[in-house]
Amino acid sequence: MRKFCWAFTNCSEASLPNLRAPLKLDVRDSTWPVESVDYIFSANTAHIMSWPEVELMFAGVGRTLRTGGRFCLYGPFNRDGHFTSESNQAFDATLRARDPNMGLRDDRALKALGRQHGLLFMAEHAMPANNRVLVWAR
């Protein structure tokens, strides 16, 4: 299986003392580095994971997010089974050529996955470059 590593950026340079440093985790590990949290943010991950890994991420979020907490997922997503732009369609083709398990995820499938793990879809926010932030609550 692929292993992805993320290089922690210089969080200390942001001068946000009330914001904890990001945690490194592997969604395939059933033990996450925290037991419960109020907020989970993941950026540009769902399209580079296999679908089973996306399912594991949502299962982990469902186990870890406290009642009233929020899960925000940033990235390029298909809307209702369709690409939202030609550039997203081309990006999806590039990803799938590299690894057929990668690719843009459909928002309907992600919303259904959230429901399976006790998450209520709350909102979506358009972002630059045909990306969106999808927001769930526990």
Predicted regions and their residues:
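Class I SAM-dependent methyltransferase SAM/SAH-binding core
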Residues: 1-31
